[in-house]
């Protein structure tokens, strides 16, 4: 289609004069490379005058071109002004534009017919509205589907509308008919068209077909051919480097002198800038705020009032004024509720005489700081302070200058208190789940452990290896294991749920094994003779003694004692004939004492003030200690009376142990405190130590004469202490923290569950929630 006349007119106004190559070089690029080192490479040093003449000629040409351009622009402006001034012509154009063409009639050619309409814009001027292009059938885009131009908006927004989006011109894209889609899908299933994929275009809702190019691409990929047509996967290599050595340079011309001397043109421009800076024509940039600040500084002058002041020493009797006390919580505009007075307190304060009031104000509460009113008595308070400073005499109080370090006790260095455990020597692995209890036998050769898997395992301490294991329960965990404290027998007591098992490991000395079995079997004859006597009162026995069964007897478990509630703690008497058990959930029967030689169980307390946690026998006297959640009670077993109540001050006692001397004990609590008690000194703790960020699970004294004790915490560490106790009642115990042993992992907020000492060496065993036991040396 040929362009119309108005289009030609616009094209003429927008045409730019074509320039030849010489004009481009001389005119457009003039100055781009002037005064540079690259142009000076091709110009001789003696031809500078000729270069200046050429530059003048180029400038004249540029001025002529600019003059011609300005003339053309002026003609266009005159033409547009004449068109706007001709009102009759504009109205006629608007009328013809509204009719859709010129006034030549149907005989006018399509080439001369304008492709626009003239309408009035919002300001009353002329606006040209061009008709939409109507491409012919042969056009490339005539068969192209209109794209949906809604962008990233989900199509779910258009589910309630008959259209699915808009074209680039803002026209609605109507949703295809469902009946037609069903018919098309039926026809496509009968005869598959070319490019059919079975998918639907989410933007238009129409079937998504492949083009011919895409089909060709898929065919090439299927035939294992190169997808892109005309691509050569093996192009000829270009030998950038050859094996021929070029000894001579391509150009041996010497470097010109101008490469090594400063440029004269740049020197001229630099000197021009230097002169401008010296004359003050070029000033550094300063912001508006800086300029205003300089102007204010010029107008105002400041003087030092104390310039001539001479420093003087303060008077001998000068006492500085006391400082005001800092404000408290009651002076806050939003104090805590406990600081606010009640209605009765407010009335009482108002009735009091102002001189009798403790405070001159009552605490008040406001929602925001902006709502706080002015302080009524502010001026009065400041006036009274001035009177106090001016009238009240001042007294200087001398403070004692004492070094705080001198108040601390002088403790020995940890290096001087060796031996004590410092490193992990061996790791005992075998339990599944937590290892809840561990114990070393009186000979110091064997280690017994019990865990959540229901197994009791016997280990050889050095070297670390397992020698025997027995499964006591499939449902309950083994909460406690303790050896009988005699060297002539090897009897181990273990608690799993409500059952207590007494066993003799088979892999020991045959004589010791025979003696141990005889001690356990002796009680069955005594129990058979006194069975009727124990049940004549009609009450149920405290515990039931029986054989555990053929399977357990073959493995070395000889006696099973069943109590009323799950057992958590087992503690032996020093002679080995009695042991006590603690069941925290047992209420009245939480503490029970068992006699091994008679197979007899007794409940010593009818009622306990609190839940029992731990119980121990005194190492040398007939005393029995029972710890509840907050107190430790000491009972005399001969006189059957309460002797002493120890008050550690802890919130929840987890464990305690008695010193071999019998006059001191240590207490561990779940509130992260380790407390040392001197029973001869007071019922209150002598020392309170906080070295763990988590709860303390177990504490233990060394039984072999070494002044050592340890605690185990849920933070996965053990703390080793030196605790020296002397027989002199005038001297207190010396407690020194020695070493923090870390090695266990914290699992489910549980770290080290139990700790025990070697009977003769400075070694300790720790049982952890990570399923391992560690030997520390």
Curated annotation (Swiss-Prot):
Disulfide topology: none
Region feature Disordered, mapped onto this chain: 1-122
Gene Ontology molecular functions: large ribosomal subunit rRNA binding; ribonucleoprotein complex binding
GO BP annotations, alphabetical order: maturation of 5.8S rRNA from tricistronic rRNA transcript (SSU-rRNA, 5.8S rRNA, LSU-rRNA); maturation of LSU-rRNA from tricistronic rRNA transcript (SSU-rRNA, 5.8S rRNA, LSU-rRNA)
Superkingdom classification of source: Eukaryota
Subunit (UniProt): Component of the NOP7 complex, composed of ERB1, NOP7 and YTM1. The complex is held together by ERB1, which interacts with NOP7 via its N-terminal domain and with YTM1 via a high-affinity interaction between the seven-bladed beta-propeller domains of the 2 proteins. The NOP7 complex associates with the 66S pre-ribosome.
Protein task: Component of the NOP7 complex, which is required for maturation of the 25S and 5.8S ribosomal RNAs and formation of the 60S ribosome.
Family of the protein in this entry: Belongs to the WD repeat BOP1/ERB1 family.
Protein name: Ribosome biogenesis protein ERB1
Gene name linked to the record: ERB1
């Amino acid at each position: 289609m040929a362009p119309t006349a108005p289009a030609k007119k616009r094209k003429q106004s927008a045409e730019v004069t074509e320039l030849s190559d010489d004009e481009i070089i001389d005119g457009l690029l003039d100055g781009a490379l002037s005064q540079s080192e690259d142009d000076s490479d091709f110009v001789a040093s003696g031809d500078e005058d000729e270069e200046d003449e050429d530059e003048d000629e180029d400038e004249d040409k540029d001025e002529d071109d600019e003059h011609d351009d300005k003339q053309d622009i002026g003609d266009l402006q005159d033409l547009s002004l004449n068109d706007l001034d001709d009102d009759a012509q504009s109205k006629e154009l608007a009328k013809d534009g509204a009719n859709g063409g010129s006034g030549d009639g149907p005989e006018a050619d399509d080439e001369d017919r304008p492709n626009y309409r003239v309408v009035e814009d919002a300001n009353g001027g002329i606006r040209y509205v061009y008709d939409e292009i109507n491409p012919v059938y042969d056009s490339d885009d005539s068969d192209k589907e209109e794209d949906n131009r809604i962008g990233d908006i989900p199509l779910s927004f258009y589910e309630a509308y008959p259209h699915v989006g808009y074209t680039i011109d803002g026209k609605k894209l109507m949703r295809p008919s469902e009946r037609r889609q069903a018919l098309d899908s039926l026809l496509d299933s009968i005869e598959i068209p070319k490019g059919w994929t079975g998918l639907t275009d989410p933007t238009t809702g129409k079937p998504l077909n492949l083009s011919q190019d895409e089909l060709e691409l898929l065919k090439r990929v299927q035939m294992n051919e190169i997808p892109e047509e005309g691509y050569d996967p093996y192009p000829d290599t270009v030998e950038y480097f050859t094996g021929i050595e070029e000894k001579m340079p391509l150009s041996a011309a010497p470097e010109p002198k101008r490469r090594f001397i400063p440029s004269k043109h740049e020197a001229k421009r630099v000197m021009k800038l230097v002169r401008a800076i010296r004359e003050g024509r070029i000033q550094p940039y300063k912001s508006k705020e800086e300029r205003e600040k300089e102007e204010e500084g010029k107008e105002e002058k400041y003087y030092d009032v104390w310039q001539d002041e001479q420093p003087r020493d303060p008077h001998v009797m000068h006492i500085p004024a006391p400082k005001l006390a800092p404000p408290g919580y009651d002076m806050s505009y939003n104090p805590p509720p406990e600081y606010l007075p009640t209605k009765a307190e407010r009335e009482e304060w108002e009735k009091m005489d102002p001189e009798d009031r403790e405070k001159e104000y009552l605490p008040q509460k406001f929602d925001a700081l902006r709502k706080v009113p002015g302080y009524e008595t502010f001026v009065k308070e400041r006036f009274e302070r001035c009177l106090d400073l001016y009238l009240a005499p001042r007294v200087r109080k001398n403070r004692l200058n004492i070094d705080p370090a001198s108040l601390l006790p002088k403790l020995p260095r940890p290096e001087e208190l060796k031996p004590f455990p410092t490193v992990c020597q061996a790791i005992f692995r075998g339990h599944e789940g937590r290892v809840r209890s561990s114990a070393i036998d009186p000979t110091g050769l064997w280690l017994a452990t019990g865990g959540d898997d229901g197994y009791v395992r016997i280990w050889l301490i050095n070297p670390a290896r397992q020698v025997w294991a027995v499964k006591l329960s499939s449902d309950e965990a083994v909460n406690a294991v303790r050896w009988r404290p005699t060297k002539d027998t090897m009897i181990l007591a273990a608690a799993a749920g409500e059952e207590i098992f007494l066993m003799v490991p088979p892999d020991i000395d045959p004589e010791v094994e025979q003696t141990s079995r005889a001690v356990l079997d002796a009680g069955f004859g005594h129990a058979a003779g006194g069975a009727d006597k124990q049940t004549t009162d009609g009450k149920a026995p405290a515990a039931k003694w029986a054989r555990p069964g053929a399977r357990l007897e073959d493995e070395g478990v000889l006696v099973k004692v069943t109590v009323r509630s799950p057992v958590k703690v087992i503690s032996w008497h020093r002679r080995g004939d009695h042991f006590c058990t603690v069941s925290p959930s047992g209420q009245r029967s939480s503490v029970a004492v068992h006699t091994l030689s008679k197979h007899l169980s007794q409940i010593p307390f009818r009622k306990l003030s609190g839940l029992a946690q731990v119980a121990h026998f005194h190492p040398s006297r007939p005393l029995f200690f029972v710890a509840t959640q907050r107190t430790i009670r000491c009972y005399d077993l001969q006189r059957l009376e309460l002797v002493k109540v120890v008050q550690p001050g802890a919130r929840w006692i987890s464990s305690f142990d008695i010193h071999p001397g019998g006059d001191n004990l240590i207490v561990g609590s779940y509130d992260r405190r380790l407390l040392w008690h001197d029973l001869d000194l007071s019922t209150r703790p002598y020392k309170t130590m906080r070295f763990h960020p988590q709860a303390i699970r177990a504490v233990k004294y060394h039984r072999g004469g070494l002044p050592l004790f340890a605690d185990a915490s849920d933070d996965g560490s053990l703390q080793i202490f030196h605790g020296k106790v002397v027989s002199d009642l005038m001297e207190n115990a010396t407690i020194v923290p020695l070493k923090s042993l870390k090695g266990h992992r914290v699992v489910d907020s549980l770290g080290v569950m139990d700790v025990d000492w070697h009977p003769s060496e400075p070694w300790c065993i720790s049982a952890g929630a990570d399923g391992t036991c560690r030997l520390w040396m």
